[in-house]
Amino acid sequence: MCGIIGYTGPLEADNILLNGLAGLEYRGYDSAGIAYFGNDSKIHLIKTVGKVAALKELVKQESDCSSHCGIGHTRWATHGGVTTENAHPHRQGLVTLIHNGIIENYHQLTEEYDLEGHLLSQTDSEVAAGVLNALYERMDHDPLLSIRHFVKELKGSYG
């Protein structure tokens, strides 16, 4: 089962995210990753197959992971193999997300939103990111309106 953590606040996000993911290891997983809002005003992704300890080593290698906002995820594969590309978080355009569950209509959404050829992974989660990004662009970058339409598009159990 996937584990999810998010943080925004005055402390350094990377340590909070990594410690939170380490606390979720008992749930079982095959890969882990984080996304954080960097000092350069960009969202950065770091993800890997394997243990949270391997993710911590990758984070240490980054030149600047200081951030006060981020999300983290441990994945238990339901769609696609155990690869770095399939690890969360996923990004499509301006949307970066993590997700737990199964989106049953992800094949239909891939076709409906013309995502074929734009996906880097084999996951329903990246399809969800692509759909939300498309809606965000269509709805004049209104996040609330985009999310309202987004949840109406998805079929399945997810969080």
Cite the ranges covered by each PLM segment.
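Conserved short alpha-helical segments that host acidic/polar catalytic motifs at enzyme active sites
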Residues: 1-159
